């Protein structure tokens, strides 16, 4: 399993998530409060070096009808710049409603999403990464079931 980092890119914060060595469980790592691009990249570089990250998984906020809206294009642009600065490939996954799901998780834990926006971003990043891990796992299982000798 390659080491990946899940990112929920926002205007004010970046939620960051990682996964276990088996690539089965995603967890929130931290929230980066954005100041400027150089500072954001420096913080991400430190995390990537510590974890031996080989790929970035970024949530794209498609519109509810599945289109790439202006927000998704902004996220894509920023993700490409970050990937280039870190010399890492970027892969995208649909992140529709992950922030809503993250807020619901916090409410279940009796924490206010309004007062814990940093946790919302971390949980959203973990949901994004978990979605990617699950999709990858399903693809691997389907390939094994088909008897593909490549896997």
Curated annotation (Swiss-Prot):
Predominant localisation class: cytoplasm
SMART domains xrefs: YqgFc
Disulfide bonds: none
RNA-binding found in the keyword field: no
InterPro entries, sorted: RNaseH-like_sf (IPR012337), YqgF (IPR005227), YqgF/RNaseH-like_dom (IPR006641), YqgF/RNaseH-like_dom_sf (IPR037027)
Compartments it resides in: Cytoplasm
Enzyme type, top EC level: hydrolase
MF terms (GO), sorted A to Z: nuclease activity
Keywords: Cytoplasm, Hydrolase, Nuclease, Ribosome biogenesis
GO cellular component: cytosol
Pfam families reported in the protein's UniProt record: RuvX
Family as reported in the entry's similarity comment: Belongs to the YqgF nuclease family.
Function statement: Could be a nuclease involved in processing of the 5'-end of pre-16S rRNA.
Name of the protein in its database record: Putative pre-16S rRNA nuclease
